[in-house]
Amino acid sequence: MARKKITLVGAGNIGGTLAHLALIKQLGDVVLFDIAQGMPNGKALDLLQTCPIEGVDFKVRGTNDYKDLENSDVVIVTAGVPRKPGMSRDDLLGINIKVMQTVGEGIKHNCPNAFVICITNPLDIMVNMLQKFSGVPDNKIVGMAGVLDSARFRTFLADELNVSVQQVQAYVMGGHGDTMVPLTKMSNVAGVSLEQLVKEGKLKQERLDAIVSRTRSGGGEIVALLKTGSAYYAPAAAGIQMAESFLKDKKMILPCAAKVKAGMYGLDEDLFVGVPTEISANGVRPIEVEISDKEREQLQVSINAVKDLNKAAAEILAK
């Protein structure tokens, strides 16, 4: 059976980490693409030399040529300008739309049947732009956001309660920004709801509120500490989890920025926004779950924020 081909567009910190994880998990041969001369080739050679140590046997190569995307099974896009201290994800809008246009055309001409995962910020708008320029169908393109945001929520809860993070089930919906919606009603620790933990005095409400707030600003916290870039280990791990669910037909239900159809979650138009999504060999399938009235109101605020950015993106394209 032919090995799968995974192409990573953008060979920076996230791209390089994605490549390493793909090799360790033995998902397939890896192509690292970047516009920087030599850089993807150097990283590919370095990664190739880990194979004897890791005990894996896959091909890794770097390139500056979009033709090398040909016949990719999965394309993960991280290309674009990363956040710097003081910048919001939205500040990247104008710059990264142009990047998505170039990348989208590269996908369209070389691997239109690939499963595409977008990680570039501002996420919900970039995945929309990437679909616009690539022509990839709704079920074959998705944005990585909710997996990462939910992982941050789970991490902070586990740390606060001093329990294994594996016992914490916590979910985040909505746009990948300050209006994201951590679902406190749905989240639990070993089956015990956060609401019950608050009632029992094991988790103070003010601490839960602080964790929700920290989750929303989790990316900015890392940007402020790094000073010269943004998170890359956890975003890469999230992207690989999504790719693996597709490649191995795991049918995992993960919070992702999928194309949600009008009528779901009160939407009056189709929109890329973070919701629980099944990822299988057939692609992505958004799922509607019951949420509280308060969470639905918060989700609407987040949806409106995504719509506003989509309008801003449309205005940029019209110029």
Curated annotation (Swiss-Prot):
SUPFAM superfamilies in alphabetical order: LDH C-terminal domain-like, NAD(P)-binding Rossmann-fold domains
Annotated GO biological process: lactate metabolic process; tricarboxylic acid cycle
Enzyme class, UniProt record, top EC level: oxidoreductase
A Pfam family annotated for this UniProt entry: Ldh_1_C
Binding sites annotated in the UniProt record for NAD(+): 10-15, 34, 96, 119-121
Catalytic activity: (S)-malate + NAD(+) = oxaloacetate + NADH + H(+)
Record's keyword annotation contains NAD: yes
Keywords on record: NAD, Oxidoreductase, Tricarboxylic acid cycle
Active-site residues annotated for this sequence: 176
Enzyme Commission number: 1.1.1.37
Keyword GTP-binding: no
Residues the record lists as binding substrate: 83, 89, 121, 152
MF-aspect GO terms: L-lactate dehydrogenase activity; L-malate dehydrogenase (NAD+) activity
Domain of life, per lineage: Bacteria
Family: Belongs to the LDH/MDH superfamily. MDH type 3 family.
Entry function: Catalyzes the reversible oxidation of malate to oxaloacetate.
PANTHER family on file: L-2-HYDROXYCARBOXYLATE DEHYDROGENASE (NAD(P)(+)) (PTHR43128), L-LACTATE DEHYDROGENASE (PTHR43128:SF16)
Protein name: Malate dehydrogenase
Lineage: Bacteria, Pseudomonadati, Pseudomonadota, Gammaproteobacteria, Thiotrichales
